[in-house]
Amino acid sequence: MAKMREMGYRPYVDGMNRKDKLRHRNIVAGDPQNAELLISAHYDTAATIGIPDLRIPRNFPVYILSQGAVLLGMLLISLLIGTAVGLATKSGDLLILTFFFAYLALMLLMMFGAANKHNVNDNTSGIAALLETMQRLSPEAREKTAFILFDHQETGSRGAKSYGAQHVEVQTMKLLVDLNCVGDGDTFVISAPKMAQDKPEYAAVRESLEENAMASGVSTQFFGRAGVQGAGDYRRFVCGVGVSAYHHSAGVGLITGRIHTSRDTVCRQENLDYLAKSLADAAQKMNDL
């Protein structure tokens, strides 16, 4: 928030939903109700138990296999713990109980355990790109652009859901471009539902992303929302657009594999500059309409 104030913005913490025990703290700069373009990123940090969160947006069979492998690994660990306790106590009941609670503990640790100290791509990169975009906007474009930093994305996009519930017009009508894991990889996947694609604001965003791609050393791939696997805050908005970066891997296709581990230490400055320039250009095009 201090950085936003240095740039002349007036950020504030959006009103928390007192009925929600997680007490989301979404940070907002600008006027989302009257803006033509919303740009967002999540600022909460994922918990980690050392298992990578493989993001595979376009290869559904491999995506399912990767998720199944994680679950199988957790089941095996839980079974080993349960078996050890069962053998030590010579109790089948304790074996079953220990297995169940060990699996439950692993699930909870994945969501609410120790925060990952290495989060360069997820999602420091998204925040950095958003802040750089804020810096580049002209005074006129600032009037038509708003920014939201969502809380609790890692626990099921709860912050974005809460914000949408309290601001229904924004949730249903406004184009929102969400930057998540945009630092590691040179291929950008942009996912947008039909309602977003029909908006002139989306046309400006897409045009700017395509215009700046080659000079920035990146490529872009555009899909409908149904054509991309994975969660994200943008899915909580009717006209939400997801933007993420990926690598190409033989036999898998697009993939990002370091997040939620100690190896999440990579962010290409070229990616941040590319997104900031493209989104600033798009905002200026909207202002010139």
Residue spans of the language-model regions?
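Short beta-strand element of the alpha/beta-hydrolase
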Residues: 36-42
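Short glycine-rich anion-binding loops that position phosphate/pyrophosphate groups of nucleotides
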Residues: 42-46, 182, 248
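Conserved beta-strand scaffold positions in the cores of enzyme catalytic domains, especially
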Residues: 11, 147, 176, 240-242
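Active-site-adjacent substrate-binding region
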Residues: 185-289
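Acidic/histidine-rich catalytic neighborhood of metal-dependent amide-processing enzymes
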Residues: 5, 81-201, 220, 228-235
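A non-catalytic alpha/beta surface segment that caps or lines the substrate-entry region
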Residues: 1-34, 50-86
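Short alpha-helix boundary/capping segments
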Residues: 59-65, 118-122, 267-274
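An acidic- and aromatic-residue-enriched active-site/binding cleft used to recognize and process polar
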Residues: 16, 44, 150-153
